[in-house]
Structure formats: structure tokens, C-alpha cells
From Swiss-Prot:
Transmembrane segments: 3-23, 48-68, 82-102, 112-132, 142-162, 166-186
Pathways involved: Lipid metabolism; phospholipid metabolism
Intracellular or extracellular location(s): Cell inner membrane
Name of encoding gene: plsY
Family: Belongs to the PlsY family.
Source species, domain of life: Bacteria
InterPro entries: G3P_acylTferase_PlsY
Lineage: Bacteria, Pseudomonadati, Spirochaetota, Spirochaetia, Leptospirales
Name of the protein in question: Glycerol-3-phosphate acyltransferase
Entry keywords, A to Z: Cell inner membrane, Cell membrane, Lipid biosynthesis, Lipid metabolism, Membrane, Phospholipid biosynthesis, Phospholipid metabolism, Transferase, Transmembrane, Transmembrane helix
Catalytic activity: an acyl phosphate + sn-glycerol 3-phosphate = a 1-acyl-sn-glycero-3-phosphate + phosphate
Entry membrane topology: Multi-pass membrane protein
Disulfide topology: none
Gene Ontology CC terms: plasma membrane
Length: 216
């Protein structure tokens, strides 16, 4: 399989809107018109149940992992640069899905899948950042933004200090590029956070969050 065909496969793989299809199939709802109007796992879990939310999360992560892994197996001559290109194609497919009129999701889970194959330690660090931010603020979107911002930093420090290896500027540059894209896809979330109208991941947390804000 040549480079263009595999890159196209990566884009199509990433563009499969699992969240939209699962919500439509099992709950009969258009996820793009409810809640945060996002097709990702958080909105699916919030609206139709976290059993489905976690399924969507796993599938969206797999959309990022599969093209990167398969490109290393079937197009090994492409090396890390081509694996990264396939990863970027998968993330762009998720963000601009042709199945949804070239609209899509935020790209966080798919990005996690891409770098879980290439830099698992950095991904674990980013997950830790996400969890800390989420536990404190109760916003998945804010945790995702901070995780995407810190991912390149965690990669650089973990590579140098833990693995004692040289930083790949291909990997680092791609991380920065995708992280910037993720921040752009969260621009509406950022506005809602500033306006204090952002939705919590779990409905029951809304009252607790409002009470906490009133005490500040």
C-alpha cells in the first residue's frame, strides 16, 4: 500500500463518527443538537449514559492508534514521520468528518490514541494533568485543554530525564501542531467557561459546582 492511499485510509478511519452513530442508533438522538453539541464521549455519556460514553471513548482512541500502528507495520520505510502524518490525518478526519459535512469532534481522544502508540509515557503524564484539572474544576473540556498544552512538555521532559534519549523534533512539532488545533476546537468551551455556562461532565456535579462557585 503506497503512501497516499494509507494516508487517505488514516483520514477515513479517523472520520468515522462513532459518537454520532451510537447516539442515533441506541437513543434515537442527534448528539450534535443536544448538550454541548459535540460528538465525543463526554457528550454521549452525559446524554445517553456512561456505558455508551466509555464505548465511544475507546473507539475514538482506537481511531488514532490503528493508523499509526498499521503504518509502522505495512509502510515501515516511512518511519516516524509517516506514522505522525497518518496520526495527523486521523485527527483531522475526526475534526472534519466527511460523514458529517466536514464537521466533527474535538480530537482529544483520537490524539491520545496516536501518541499512545508513539510516546506512551508522555500520554500517561498528560492523563495525570487532565485528571488533576478535572477533579478540581469538574470540566472535561478544561482538563483536555491543559492536557493538550502540557503534552509536548511532558514528552520533552520524560524523554530527556526518564528515557535518557534525544527528543524527536518530528514528534514534538506534531504534538504542538495538534495541541494548537485542539485548543481551537475548544474555543466555544473556553467562552462558556469564562461565562460560567460550561456543562459539567456529570449532571449531579452542576449543583455542587454552583455552590462551590458561590462560596468563592
Amino acid at each position: 500500500m503506497n503512501f497516499p492511499i494509507f494516508a487517505l485510509f488514516s483520514f477515513v478511519s479517523g472520520s468515522i463518527p462513532f459518537g454520532y452513530w451510537i447516539a442515533l442508533r441506541f437513543a434515537g438522538v442527534d448528539i450534535r443538537k443536544l448538550g454541548s453539541k459535540n460528538i465525543g464521549a463526554t457528550n454521549v455519556g452525559r446524554l445517553i449514559g456512561w456505558k455508551f460514553g466509555f464505548i465511544v471513548l475507546a473507539l475514538d482512541i482506537t481511531k488514532g492508534m490503528l493508523p499509526v500502528y498499521l503504518s509502522s507495520v505495512y509502510v515501515p520505510e516511512g518511519g516516524i514521520p509517516f506514522q505522525l502524518l497518518c496520526g495527523v490525518c486521523a485527527v483531522l478526519g475526526h475534526m472534519f468528518s466527511p460523514f458529517l459535512g466536514f464537521r466533527g469532534g474535538k480530537g482529544v481522544a483520537t490524539t491520545f490514541g496516536v501518541f499512545l502508540v508513539l510516546t506512551p509515557i508522555a500520554c500517561l503524564g498528560a492523563v495525570l494533568v487532565f485528571w488533576v484539572v478535572y477533579k478540581f474544576f469538574k470540566f472535561v473540556s478544561l482538563g483536555s485543554i491543559f492536557a493538550s498544552i502540557t503534552l509536548p512538555l511532558v514528552y520533552a521532559f520524560s524523554t530527556i530525564l526518564l528515557l535518557h534519549e534525544e527528543v524527536s523534533y518530528w514528534v514534538l512539532g506534531t504534538m504542538v501542531f495538534i495541541s494548537f488545533g485542539i485548543i481551537l476546537t475548544h474555543r466555544e468551551n473556553i467562552i462558556r467557561i469564562l461565562n460560567r455556562s460550561e456543562l459539567f461532565a456529570v449532571k449531579g456535579e452542576e449543583q455542587d459546582g454552583d455552590s462551590e462557585r458561590n462560596r468563592r
